[in-house]
């Protein structure tokens, strides 16, 4: 194990002293992504021009990706619209590497979703792999053991020539890294839409478990405490990734950005996880920060800024893979599998012993000071002398102009049912087969089969169930459920309501599993903030999500904003991905999405309206217009209470939410989950809700779920729904003998035919 710096190349170093005497020196601030007003502000803060190293730090830390400079004025709502009741389970909120939630019995869970969109388009395998690695290190840095990951994904049109390249690379990268770490992949989404052509969305969620006393924070306190960098060596990969890739739009005329994509090593990260957990268990580190976006620039400035003093480090002590790296490149490098920690002098020997045990390289960089300054030297000469808060926290804040798009009124007036493509299909059975074989509704087993969903042995549920479920405590069965959801079409039609709908579906998915929703993380994927119409979409979505979280009583614990998701002037649909975490007293009581027992009654909970605008069926007919389904969060809460209580008390044997694809999709998915058919009647539903059989099947009305109820529990279940005043209707029974889905008077489809159609689509395009 090497603990001393590698051979360094000699450079003409731009020192602080030199910067003070050479104000005329030209610097590449624009090439590093800074605006002219931002460069002027840096000069004002420092009272001189920045050194090359300081410029590198400010450029990455003031990037859109790191500073949230265009979004933070809106994101403040997540902290403002929080009641005391919502804070009850919150141990660590927005501002740290990940939120932490109390789940009872002294256990806590930390979870977060982030994006790695732009790198995954440039270099699909490594971009996706390091997206998993980065979010897992966020979880480690909170003091937790990672226990699962999820991956909400969006690609362009399934038949576009470039989609196969992206799908193969991204799915392989996620599976290759996550499987090597030994982390189950318990859920996510796979959506295909031409609006994501050239801008795939690769969002990654990780969850970890820890005891309350094990929580760790990112701060550097205690004058004289040592600062150490450990893990992989620093190389040239990922230099400027935060500013070059994640903070500007793509332009095909610009040179290749492959060098800005990080390269990951999951086996090095696996060792790093165990190494960190041993450090935490022995209380050897006082503060810790993972190195992700902006690398050492971020770690040093955030640790110092969050602490009580300052920091002084020697950059030549950094272990390098490439000795030709300049100081600025070392500061900006986003090489993976690295951590920075603060260690008391008394714990130095213990720290080194743990490093030796795990054969992890490390280098002592410096110490915590009382100066309030972040000072970085290169071979004894100062190249950075800044107030760390100006780098990490007090960057520019833009209240960018925004306005409602002029075209939106016409779009919202163009309802599907009033359009010329809304003809009711003559053969409803064929329509169901068409729906379930469409790219978005087809089985995603081609993807999920490449992931290990059950490694570690604590997975109680995973895709295709509504939520992923993980056991936390083997003795009591205490566990958590997670679901991620978003619908870009809904948000395009109405960003505020679309964001509410994303939360409502994720909340509902957690409840159908039987867990009680507790907290939220979000990844807000949008186009350029410099476009006032995109900024309006963003502002509306954030307001809608914040309001919905308040109404449902679930706080946002943290997340990510990904802007500039557009090629040229074409932006993606606004896509706020929402992750909801819920808790089980015992995961053994979790409810799967498919029925299993012959003769059980099948009930539909909720009201169905003629709501097909933005639906999957409308999408298949090439239509996008109108208003998304009405969201009634009060009804969502009532539905969740019914589902949670019914699951806990053994009143339901299966539960599946209704969302994309409506009742048709839910019936097929519940039947195919365990290969058990059903006999269904829709006439009473059509009469009760004043809709046609076609609308009953394909409407995407919200606050609905399908459940199967044992005959012995029907009276109790009906009484509960009636007492709560919630709409419920017996549609039919589970039929284990027929091997078919029989919707009486409409169609009968064998499960073999449905399964063949459902599972053939992705292999057809991707092999």
From Swiss-Prot:
InterPro entries listed in its UniProt record: PRibForGlyAmidine_synth_PurL, PurL_linker, PurM-like_C_dom, PurM-like_C_sf, PurM-like_N, PurM-like_N_sf
Subcellular location: Cytoplasm
One of the GO BP terms on file: 'de novo' IMP biosynthetic process
SUPFAM superfamilies: PurM C-terminal domain-like, PurM N-terminal domain-like
GO cellular component, one term: cytoplasm
GO MF, one annotated term: magnesium ion binding
Cited PANTHER family: PHOSPHORIBOSYLFORMYLGLYCINAMIDINE SYNTHASE SUBUNIT PURL
Protein name: Phosphoribosylformylglycinamidine synthase subunit PurL
Annotated organism of origin: Renibacterium salmoninarum (strain ATCC 33209 / DSM 20767 / JCM 11484 / NBRC 15589 / NCIMB 2235)
Gene: purL
